[in-house]
């Protein structure tokens, strides 16, 4: 019995030791397993971290000044980019409009990094940026885009292409046919003075005379010339119309003949007309000074007419600016054909200093992928900066607010018009004109690289030598010879010759010659 009891004690001790050893082994094993799991977890985390791309910041360079709630608006765009899985962030760099081109040129020359560039064809065309290597080809990125090719017509892409390479993204924000071939005046004053709509140059001169004789107020009314662009509205009164004038350098008729604009009879007729306007006091004395502003002059209400369709904003806003005003826009010589001189007026290109050209184009594709994205970029935050009025109409909560205006980066597929916008503005700017006659070189793009120095010099010389004659400040008879000599010294003949050569090749490819 005693032996049996001893045996039982020994057996219990053995089992305890056995369980203890086994327990220790299990504890060690669990600990080891835990360590292995943690290691695996860390490896997975590292792999995920490597797979998640860091956001690329896209810097958009544009003229203008920052709006008050710019940070909030940008954050809304960036939040939407993140929600859409774009791995992109937008940053907007503003340069005051009056120094935009000078500052931009300096930034490009010093290699300052930015990605997207707002281009205004009336001030400096994208071809000039190509010539000085300020922008780069983006063909391979555009070809991958689903939305850019959907919302921008093929004829615009053709006009954005040089030697088979796309260099810029057109802003398809308006119909360009006859878009800048009209004038805007005060209909209220036309009624008051008993005037009919002008149709000829003589009618315009008479209109000026009647306005000046009957005007009440401290300041006399003036003509407001948008002189950095050709006076297309005036061309409609000439017998040889339609034709195209580009940059006050090139005259192109509908047969594809290219001439130095200032050497044409058409230039002479327009210059003599403006000389008469100037001598009679209808053109501002300081029109070429850096301080003169067409916009500020228009806001005074003391004007006879201003070039192009200027029915921007609503009728109510204009009534606040100029009490009693009734603006209207008309075409001279209504019998002249509807004419499309250019494919687009504004565009967005990728800077040669960009480190993220593909991502920059992806942002543009994202912008045009939905109404929501477009609204955020152009109008801001619904309920904060604008109110949806249904259809394609909206109301600005602050009438003076402007984020990234349609004319910079807009598209007809998404554009909204303020409630109360002039119907004529929508008719002129927003409705396609399939019956329009296209310029023979509509999709021709001049490549100035072979005459890059001469081309840049000629553009600068136009400002110094041609503008004063164009505006009538210097008479054609007195200024023409010296101005032409300076243009020829700048290399205009060589530039015209190269332009004609390329135009001939273009027309030959199209089967026109």
Predicted regions and their residues:
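Extracytoplasmic/secretory soluble proteins
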Residues: 3, 10-513
């Amino acid at each position: 019995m005693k032996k049996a009891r001893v045996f039982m004690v020994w057996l219990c001790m053995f089992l305890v030791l056995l369980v203890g050893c086994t327990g220790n082994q299990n504890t060690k094993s669990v600990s080891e397993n835990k360590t292995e799991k943690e290691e695996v977890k860390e490896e997975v985390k590292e792999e995920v971290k490597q797979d998640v791309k860091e956001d690329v910041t896209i810097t958009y360079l544009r003229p203008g000044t920052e709006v008050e709630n710019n940070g909030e608006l940008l954050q809304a765009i960036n939040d939407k980019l993140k929600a859409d899985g774009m791995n992109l962030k937008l940053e907007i760099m503003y340069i005051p409009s009056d120094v935009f081109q000078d500052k931009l040129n300096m930034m490009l020359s010093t290699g300052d990094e930015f990605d997207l560039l707002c281009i205004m064809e009336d001030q400096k065309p994208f071809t000039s940026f190509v010539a000085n290597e300020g922008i780069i080809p983006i063909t391979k990125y555009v070809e991958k885009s689903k939305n850019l090719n959907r919302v921008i017509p093929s004829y615009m892409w053709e006009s954005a292409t040089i030697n088979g390479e796309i260099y810029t993204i057109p802003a398809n924000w308006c119909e360009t046919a006859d878009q800048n071939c009209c004038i805007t005046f005060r209909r209220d004053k036309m009624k008051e003075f008993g005037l009919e709509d002008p149709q000829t140059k003589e009618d315009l001169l008479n209109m000026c005379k009647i306005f000046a004789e009957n005007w009440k107020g401290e300041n006399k009314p003036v003509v407001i010339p948008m002189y950095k662009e050709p006076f297309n509205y005036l061309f409609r009164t000439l017998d040889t119309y339609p034709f195209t004038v580009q940059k006050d350098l090139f005259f192109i008729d509908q047969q594809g003949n290219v001439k130095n604009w200032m050497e044409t009879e058409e230039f002479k007729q327009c210059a003599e007309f403006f000389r008469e306007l100037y001598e009679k006091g209808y053109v501002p004395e300081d029109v070429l000074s850096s301080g003169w502003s067409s916009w500020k002059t228009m806001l005074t209400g003391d004007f006879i007419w201003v070039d192009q369709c200027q029915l921007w904003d609503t009728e109510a806003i204009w009534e606040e600016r100029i009490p009693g005003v009734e603006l209207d826009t008309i075409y001279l010589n209504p019998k002249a054909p509807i004419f499309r001189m250019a494919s687009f007026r504004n565009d967005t290109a990728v800077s040669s200093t960009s480190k993220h050209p593909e991502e920059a184009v992806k942002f543009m594709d994202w912008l045009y992928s939905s109404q929501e994205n477009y609204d955020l970029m152009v109008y801001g935050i619904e309920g904060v900066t604008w109110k949806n009025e249904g259809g394609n109409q909206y109301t600005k909560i602050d009438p003076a607010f402007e984020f990234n205006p349609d004319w910079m980066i807009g598209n007809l597929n998404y554009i909204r018009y303020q409630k109360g916008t002039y119907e004529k503005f929508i008719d002129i700017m927003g409705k396609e004109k399939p019956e329009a006659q296209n310029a023979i070189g509509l999709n021709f793009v001049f490549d100035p690289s072979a005459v890059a120095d001469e081309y840049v010099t000629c553009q600068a010389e136009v400002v110094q030598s041609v503008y004063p004659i164009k505006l009538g400040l210097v008479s054609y008879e007195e200024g023409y010879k010296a101005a032409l000599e300076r243009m020829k010294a700048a290399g205009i003949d060589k530039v015209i010759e190269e332009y004609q050569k390329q135009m001939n090749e273009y027309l030959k490819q199209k089967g026109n010659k």
